[in-house]
Amino acid sequence: MPFSAPPTEHFDVIIVGGGHAGCEAAITAARLGLSTALFTLNLDRIAWQPCNPAVGGPAKSQLVHEVDALGGVIGRLADATALQKRVLNASRGPAVWALRAQTDKRLYSRQMLQLLQQTANLSLREAMVTGLEVKGDPSGGGEHWEPAQGHAAQITGVRTYFGSIYRAQAVVLTTGTFLGGQIWVGNQSMPAGRAGEQAAEGLTEALESLGFQTNRLKTGTPARVDRRSIALDQLEEQPSDAADRFFSFDPTAWVSGEQMSCHITRTTASTHQLIKENLELTPIYGGFLDSKGPRYCPSIEDKIVRFADKDSHQIFLEPEGRDTPEIYVQGFSTGLPERLQLDLLRTLPGLEQCVMLRPAYAVDYDYLPATQLSPSLQTKRVKGLFTAGQLNGTTGYEEAAAQGLVAGLNAARLVQGQEQVQFPREGSYIGTMIDDLVSKDLHEPYRVLTSRSEYRLILRGDNADRRLTPLGYQLGLIDARRWQLFQRKQTALEDEKQRLEKQRLKASDPAAPALEAKTGATIKGSITLADLLRRPGVRSADLIEHGLVDPELALGVREGAEIDIKYSGYLQRQQQQIDQLKRQSQRRLPANLDYANISTLSKEAREKLTAVGPLNFAQASQIPGVSKADLTALLVWLELQKRRTLAASGHDR
């Protein structure tokens, strides 16, 4: 018999989970005027960073910029709590430039809690949510339900471990690694969402009873060591190189505290030998655990097995805060038993006498394959039920925060009777990620990568505000002050681009010889500053050096103008591809098309397209396993066939 009790409280939106997804979802819904409650197992661990205390990196920084451009908070807090900032891939093109910040994990959590407590319309509750209240079919349509049938049930609230019921019109699940969480050290395990915190009970069973498919994934975190026990003076120092760069587009959030250095060490032959001799004692190689872990964040034993030709791997020693001696040993997660972990750490140069404060561990947990969601992150079976973050199979604070904002936004709009917002793949990394999640059958933790986007030159971090802030303002996520800041920046950017296109440098000007020497190309007569920037090797910093650009010009304006000018041809072509793909969405596909012989399609796409036989591109785009890259390849192939047919018919005449 179903448990029933009078409701304890009523809210418009309930968020379950206080991690990075849950916090963004709660703040977003509350700022849109909805009565919102965030439930978490531990209010003292809000927005905790249980693995690497860092924000950003390749593609991840683009996500953070996008969340900020839409009014989210992860970028502001990363700026406010940064211990160190670096620009990655600076020697490559702007499509892959990435800001990365090492953050003070305890300060980050405290500031997020303060922000939540100060947010109007938002209530915080410490409780374990174990059940979902629904009306309609309690089986979610059963095993024969199909998405075309629409929602089989509607969410009405949640139930907690101690029997309280809380009503809501929308519920967002952001449970991270806590659903059925089990942490492993060697062959020893215990129920936990992360070290020192209990796993969540009941929700997996509640989801399965509603017809949802669940599965297991794993992740892991390395040991923490005492900074005072490391011979840092023997190691390569890695200082901050980007203290003047920020994730947030809001200058009021730009805070630069005292910067701290990271340090670099490497594995040795002794490291590799110890691991090889004890592989069978780890959960994966010993067969105790078969959940799939993140491909792009492997354990040290995975690295040594998969890259057997390498005799050394780089390891980074990163501070966890200004007021703690704990050092995060990046790149050194392991499943070895605790009794071997200290010996393993002491094989690293500089760590021969180190003290291990916390052992490394792996955690496996339940997740909900995101093909059961619509692009709004609402579940297809149950109206009003949304999911975000690691529950959807992703890994990373940035991926979680972005999904949380989208889920919170759409949960609020559902309650208000407004249309759901879907982020197109070509418009943002948020859209790229969600499209991948809901359309592909993923069996390992998903991490956003620049290579996942076909439009990465357009989807840069520096222009995230240009791409998304107008939408954020339209949706009510950006306030009037931020909107005015945005408009002023765009005016300054356009003014600078026009100036660079008009102002000319004469061959007789004092700066000309130096700039000619830098580019290896002669200035004949005169040249516009824009054309000068288009030459390889010339940057706006060079123009500043010669008094041709105002050094007081905001960095975002200066770099934005430079990128727009330098890469204008590429940007135009990529935009044309996007526009063409939009136009082609209703283009019909021949019924007898032999996908198996189109070699530019991925193997999975050939199989899925053959099996489904879509009538047009719009239908093809909805098939799980058929990516936007596959659609582009198919479009190019059809155009080539069309030209060949026309050429052949012309030749026949």
Swiss-Prot record:
A GO MF term: flavin adenine dinucleotide binding
Alphabetized SUPFAM superfamilies for the sequence: FAD/NAD(P)-binding domain
Binding residues for NAD(+): 293-307
GO BP, sorted A to Z: tRNA methylation; tRNA wobble uridine modification
PROSITE patterns: GIDA_1, GIDA_2
Cofactor list: FAD
Binding sites annotated in the UniProt record for FAD: 17-22
Keyword Flavoprotein: yes
Assigned keywords, A-Z: Cytoplasm, FAD, Flavoprotein, NAD, tRNA processing
Pfam families in the cross-refs: GIDA (PF01134), GIDA_C_1st (PF21680), SAM_GIDA_C (PF13932)
Classification via NCBIfam families: mnmG_gidA (TIGR00136)
Species of provenance: Prochlorococcus marinus (strain MIT 9313)
Cellular localization per UniProt: Cytoplasm
Identification of the protein by name: tRNA uridine 5-carboxymethylaminomethyl modification enzyme MnmG
Any one annotated GO CC term: cytoplasm
Family the entry assigns: Belongs to the MnmG family.
Domain of life: Bacteria
